[in-house]
């Protein structure tokens, strides 16, 4: 893609995501305080504040909410520029029109983020360098899409231009890892973690590491060599672990090893020589308002959750047929003398070795693709899956039906027992053969949510999650509607709807037609599940009868974020019209 085309495309995408987020979340009453009218057949949302007026062309989406009709221009009263409207310019206009609210918003922070997001997306579109390995290519497309419908997703706060160049998967730049020696007395690990696996990674530099430690009067036998992300090594560890470094509990060694490429998550790094082996390490820049740490308790919780997932796969016929799980039990972490697992510091120095199912790694006839990659605005993966360049409407409808059917069958089969895996598109992968879904592969198990009453009803043991007693947690749920909210928001309104959105843009298939198909599949799959008898009607009511569904707010919480955000993406819940209800 030529540079000027890429710049215009990137600006249009970020503007669309911004306007959609404002509309979805009704920020500053942009929907509720507007007049809806039609001009020349186009629906317009007319928003007036402080004597200024904006006309936004909109359409009624399959989510039963207005979205920006981006093929038509937004009109800002008094604006005379012939240049296309940018997201940053539109945001500044909204802020200026709402001085009573915006004095509490992080206006400049958001404006900076929108500008950076557009700049980086333009670069990634113009310099997209696809890997030859189909799985790695899928990760690049998932990274290119990033978090669907999030206008600031492309901003990685804390990175310089040179960092984006190396650490964005789209640009296909591999890099070596650095090394920190961690004293064995200050380390914990997964229950079944095999230290040999970790040591095998650092074999190429073990001799040098031994000599360097000897030079400081230290013995390699007292330490474990941790792989460290080079950005983390340079910018974070010297400060966050200054005391431990002075006490030789942590020794930073200027050694490099291996050849790795960022995955779509940026923390999980793909071994170029063995693409189905990933090393997950902290990378504490800020993305989506959260620091990309890998807290120790998350890995412990992931280990517990993985046991539960495997137990359910053995128990359930549909899960046994369709689901495979990445092995994420091999992990190690620095641990202070106080054994305080809730310390933020720990999340800066951990490592996890993720292994994909061997049967997939050895199968050259399958394509393993994350659902997030299918939401990228590019035909390449669809052509690869279907095995042809010219894809008809019937082809893409059949493919979407297959994807939705398997995904919903798997998800609801887990949910009937009271377990809900991480459902956003980055962490659900689909294995295709001959254009059909064969397997659903789960990764990143640290946020498998549970509904205690259903686990108990099925005589299943509760995972021993490490959670703070003094703050709310999202892992353990006692309320059925709260449990289902994660499915409604992440699985349907984000993951599946993002794929619907991409198919509409790429192949011209109406999103309403695709959503109608999705509704029918969901109804069929819900009907086949053996829900806990006393809750059957409640499930149908939550999904199909209620007038509203929960909806994840992503922009509004960022407007009020004053700090680094810690390790969790700021979000809130609001309610929106139920997308499973058809409105005339």
From Swiss-Prot:
<comment type="pathway">
    <text>Siderophore biosynthesis.</text>
</comment>
<dbReference type="GO" id="GO:0016881">
    <property type="term" value="F:acid-amino acid ligase activity"/>
</dbReference>
<dbReference type="GO" id="GO:0019290">
    <property type="term" value="P:siderophore biosynthetic process"/>
</dbReference>
<dbReference type="InterPro" id="IPR007310">
    <property type="entry name" value="Aerobactin_biosyn_IucA/IucC_N"/>
</dbReference>
<keyword id="KW-0547">Nucleotide-binding</keyword>
<protein>
    <recommendedName>
        <fullName>Staphyloferrin B synthase</fullName>
        <ecNumber>6.3.2.56</ecNumber>
    </recommendedName>
</protein>
<dbReference type="InterPro" id="IPR022770">
    <property type="entry name" value="IucA/IucC-like_C"/>
</dbReference>
<dbReference type="Pfam" id="PF04183">
    <property type="entry name" value="IucA_IucC"/>
</dbReference>
<comment type="subunit">
    <text>Forms a mixture of monomer and dimer in solution.</text>
</comment>
<dbReference type="InterPro" id="IPR037455">
    <property type="entry name" value="LucA/IucC-like"/>
</dbReference>
<dbReference type="Pfam" id="PF06276">
    <property type="entry name" value="FhuF"/>
</dbReference>
<comment type="similarity">
    <text>Belongs to the IucA/IucC family.</text>
</comment>
<dbReference type="GO" id="GO:0005524">
    <property type="term" value="F:ATP binding"/>
</dbReference>
<keyword id="KW-0436">Ligase</keyword>
<keyword id="KW-0067">ATP-binding</keyword>
């Amino acid at each position: 893609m030529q540079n000027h085309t890429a710049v215009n495309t990137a600006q249009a995408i970020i503007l669309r995501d911004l306007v959609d987020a404002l509309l979805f979340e009704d920020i500053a009453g942009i929907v509720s305080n507007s007049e809806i009218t039609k001009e020349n057949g186009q629906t317009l949302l007319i928003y007036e504040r402080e004597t200024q007026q904006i006309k936004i062309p909109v359409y009624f989406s399959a989510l039963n909410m207005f979205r920006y009709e981006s093929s038509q221009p937004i009109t800002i009263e008094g604006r005379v520029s012939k240049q296309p409207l940018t997201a940053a310019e539109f945001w500044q206009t909204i802020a200026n029109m709402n001085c009573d609210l915006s004095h509490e918003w992080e206006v400049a922070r958001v404006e900076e983020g929108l500008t950076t997001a557009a700049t980086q997306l333009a670069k990634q579109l113009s310099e997209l360098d696809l890997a030859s390995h189909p799985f790695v290519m899928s990760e690049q497309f998932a990274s290119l899409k990033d978090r669907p419908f999030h206008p600031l997703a492309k901003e990685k706060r804390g990175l310089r231009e040179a960092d984006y160049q190396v650490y964005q998967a789209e640009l296909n730049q591999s890099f070596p890892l650095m090394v920190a020696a961690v004293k064995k007395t200050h380390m914990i690990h997964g229950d079944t973690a095999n230290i040999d696996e970790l040591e095998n990674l650092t074999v190429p530099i073990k001799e040098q590491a031994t000599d360097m430690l000897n030079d400081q009067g230290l013995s390699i036998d007292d330490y474990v060599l941790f792989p460290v992300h080079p950005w983390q090594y340079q910018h974070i560890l010297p400060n966050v672990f200054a005391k431990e470094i002075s006490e030789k509990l942590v020794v930073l060694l200027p050694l490099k090893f291996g050849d790795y490429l960022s995955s779509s998550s940026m923390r999980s790094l793909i071994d170029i020589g063995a693409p189905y082996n990933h090393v997950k390490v902290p990378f504490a820049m800020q993305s989506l308002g959260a620091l990309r740490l890998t807290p120790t308790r998350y890995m412990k919780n992931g280990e517990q959750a993985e046991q539960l997932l495997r137990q359910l796969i053995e128990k359930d016929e549909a899960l046994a047929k369709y689901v495979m799980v990445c092995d994420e039990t091999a992990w190690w972490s620095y641990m202070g003398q106080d054994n305080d697992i809730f310390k933020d510091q720990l999340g800066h120095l951990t490592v996890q070795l993720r292994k994909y199912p061997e049967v997939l790694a050895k199968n050259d006839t399958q394509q393993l693709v994350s659902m997030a990659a299918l939401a990228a605005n590019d035909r390449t993966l669809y052509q690869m899956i279907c095995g042809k360049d010219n894809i008809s409407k019937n082809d893409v409808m059949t493919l979407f039906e297959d994807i939705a059917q398997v995904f919903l069958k798997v998800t609801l089969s887990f949910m009937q027992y009271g377990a809900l895996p991480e459902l956003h598109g980055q962490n659900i992968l689909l294995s295709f053969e001959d254009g059909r879904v064969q397997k659903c592969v789960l990764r990143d198990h640290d946020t498998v949510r549970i509904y205690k009453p259903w686990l108990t009803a099925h005589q299943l043991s509760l995972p021993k999650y490490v959670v703070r007693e003094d703050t709310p947690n999202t892992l353990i749920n006692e309320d059925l509607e709260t449990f289902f909210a994660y499915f409604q928001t992440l699985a349907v309104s984000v993951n599946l709807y993002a794929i619907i959105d991409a198919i509409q843009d790429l192949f011209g298939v109406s999103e309403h037609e695709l959503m109608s198909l999705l509704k029918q599949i969901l109804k069929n799959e819900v009907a086949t599940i053996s829900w806990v008898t006393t809750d059957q009607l409640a499930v149908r009511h939550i999904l199909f009868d209620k007038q509203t569904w929960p909806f994840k707010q992503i922009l509004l919480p960022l407007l009020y974020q004053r700090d680094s955000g810690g390790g969790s993406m700021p979000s809130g819940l609001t309610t929106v019209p139920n997308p499973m209800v058809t409105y005339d």
